[in-house]
């Protein structure tokens, strides 16, 4: 029987693992009593050394390590309200957190040792585009793409260099992959034109992916929204796994026909059309469909839960139904 780490690598590389790998989260959801990894299994381990650290400065506001001030909404993460890079003249003075410092990973080492059989993912929150608009402001960054192109590219390069240093730190810890986030789509299109994306972001992502591959690590990117216009580009520059919480706005059939067998998908059932409805029959059917259509390439699909189910109104029973369905149908076709 393969170890979890070997199962995941085989799924990503389309080498016919014995079952679909699952990530049913090592973190407990407030209000849920089920220990999902203990009950249903877990093939992954998140290493969180450079992830999202912050300090509350009021009851509803907190500041992250980059100097962004967030406003919370109930129990949700909230959004950035104060952006530290107000003027481009301040770019040279930008506060870069010391995320590659080995000291901040010391508390992760015992857990890494205990999870050598798992596929270990080093987490980097808000890797490139999201980091840029957190620092500059979303609307302002949109204008900057056309009015301050040189400064935008300088900022992108600073973030890429920083990200590569963090990647190397995770490599030294023995991680098998990098997991990062960058939401690129709204419901029906990209947030910027594909042409602009290819000019500014594509070469910088390639440097990031290449850095991971140089250290023998896979790269997993979370991105929500309609992103089919750039999936071919991501595949071309070496993205190994796309983690998407929505599929129905693009179409599972389309994803399978155009991209199946070329990139590995890492998904829960759709959080907008399926999991949110708490319809057990629909959840089971969609879990089966994801495996049958995206995982019919001797791999190419890995199952996961959604990390904030209560934020979308998903019940504990619905999450259990999804996990059980992924286990029930978790063989490649």
Feature-to-residue mapping (PLM):
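A common structural microfeature
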Residues: 19-21, 43, 59
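Active-site loop segments of alpha/beta catalytic cores
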Residues: 1-28, 32, 63, 95-333
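Segments that shape or occlude catalytic/ligand-binding pockets
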Residues: 29-56
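Short aromatic-enriched loop/helix-cap "lid" or pocket-rim segments at secondary-structure transitions
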Residues: 33-36, 58-59, 74-76, 82, ...
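A contiguous, low-structure linker/loop signature
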Residues: 57-102, 114-121
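Glycine-centered secondary-structure boundary/capping sites
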Residues: 14, 38-43, 65-67
């Amino acid at each position: 029987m393969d170890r979890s780490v070997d199962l995941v690598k085989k799924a990503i590389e389309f080498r016919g693992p014995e079952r679909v790998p699952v990530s049913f989260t090592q973190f407990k959801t407030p209000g849920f009593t089920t220990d999902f990894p203990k009950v249903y299994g877990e093939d992954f381990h998140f290493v969180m050394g450079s992830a999202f650290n912050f300090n509350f400065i009021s009851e509803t506001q907190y500041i992250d390590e980059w100097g962004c001030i967030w406003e919370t909404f109930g129990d949700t993460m909230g959004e950035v309200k104060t952006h530290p890079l107000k003027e481009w003249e301040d770019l040279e003075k930008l506060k870069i957190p010391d995320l590659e410092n080995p000291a901040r990973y010391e508390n992760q080492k015992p857990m890494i040792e205990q999870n050598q059989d798992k596929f270990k993912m080093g987490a980097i929150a808000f890797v490139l585009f999201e980091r840029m608009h957190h620092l500059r402001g979303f609307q302002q960054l949109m204008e900057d793409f056309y009015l301050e192109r040189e400064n935008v590219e300088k900022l992108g390069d600073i973030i890429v260099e920083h990200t590569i240093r963090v990647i190397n730190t995770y490599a030294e810890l023995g991680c098998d992959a990098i997991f990062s986030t960058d939401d690129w789509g709204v419901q029906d299109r990209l947030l910027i034109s594909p042409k602009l994306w290819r000019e500014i972001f594509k070469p910088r992502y390639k440097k990031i992916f290449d850095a991971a591959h140089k250290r023998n690590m896979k790269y997993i990117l979370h991105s929500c929204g309609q992103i089919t216009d750039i999936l071919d580009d991501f595949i071309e520059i070496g993205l190994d796994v796309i983690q998407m919480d929505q599929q129905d706005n693009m179409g599972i059939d389309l994803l399978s026909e155009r991209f199946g067998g070329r990139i590995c998908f890492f998904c829960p059932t759709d959080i907008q059309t399926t999991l949110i409805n708490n319809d057990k029959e629909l959840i089971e059917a969609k879990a089966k469909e994801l495996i049958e259509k995206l995982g019919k390439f001797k791999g190419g699909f890995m199952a996961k839960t959604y990390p904030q189910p209560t934020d979308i109104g998903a019940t504990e029973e619905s999450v259990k139904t999804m996990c059980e369905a992924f286990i029930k149908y978790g063989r490649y076709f």
